[in-house]
Amino acid sequence: MPNKYWKYENLKSVHLELSTLCNSICPWCPRYDNFSPNLNPNIVEGAYSLERFKKHFPVEFLQQIRMWTFAGDYGDPCTAPDIILIIDYINDYTTHSPTIQINTNGGMKNEKFWYNLGMSLNENSYVIFSVDGLEDTNHIYRRNVKWHKVMNAMKTFSSTGAKGIWEYLKFRHNEHQIDNAKEMADSFGFEIRFKNPNGFEGEPMPARDKDYNIEYEIYPAKGVQIAPIATSSREFANRIDTLNYDEYKDKVESFYKDRSTCITCSANHSFGGGYEIRINHDGTVWPCSFFGHLSKKYLKGRTVSKVQQWQAQDIFKDINNNLEELTLKEILDSDPFHGVYSKWEGNKIMLCSDVCGENKMMEKIYA
């Protein structure tokens, strides 16, 4: 095992959460509390400005980055007022042509914005439109997203000749529309990808109102089984808030010891043999998107991911990983993720084993 992963000089890819603002109210989204439209209390709403971006990512740093991913767990990057200015800054001051991937639900802004966004992208870059159905079904999961705005966005963007990808989460309520979606994607000149969603926590996914009443339930596509959650797992997760992690650390690290898997870290990919990092809107730096996702997730009364979050909070409790206080080089030179990679053997880090083990329990959402 190398002495240190995530060396500053080896970075080739950055996954940045540009914004914690969003027009959509997707039930499982960690931006919201317990499948409701109520904002997660851990979230501070805001968006990266161009000036803040320049401060965190100076011109000399741009030169080593081959890929930028603008996708958020807590917001849609296209809600950021300065997103096009940031893209222009990257393209204008990078001596090569980096790939910029943007994930969006497409339900915000106007035609001028989508035209300008398409025109701002270089030949290696693209937008992934997360649209889960057609006019009568997309809003079932993408709550509050207006279909006419999505269509205006996709049509206008496609008219620029920029590369677009339609990403379609398959549910029981929209799987009958797959062929129609393929035809529509062809009309835009978009590739279309179909994926199975996360978010089924031992039962159908509830869509709750602001008072936490269930308005309706969402089911996976036919043939996809909802994995049950053992009663013992629920009981342990419910006790976590009253327990001292130090007393249970060995137990947590042994939960997956019998898995016949090895961890192949997705953040250690092939962009010149370098590594990817995730940076949340608040400036915190994480080893990957999954740790960034977990860092602000509000799990009161929940079971799934609660033990993983408990473990992660202990791993990172003594590190300073915030770009508002240190430079990215200072953060990574301190080897902040040693507590992650040093325990990959034996599947001791639950989140890593779940998402990057041989038997992945989660499908990677980001391309």
Protein language model regions, located:
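Recognition helices and adjacent regulatory flanks at domain boundaries
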Residues: M1-L11, S24
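Radical SAM enzyme [4Fe-4S]-AdoMet core and its adjacent flexible, acidic
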Residues: E9, E17, Y32-Y48, L62-Q63, ...
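Immediate flanking context of iron-sulfur cluster ligation sites
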Residues: D335-L351
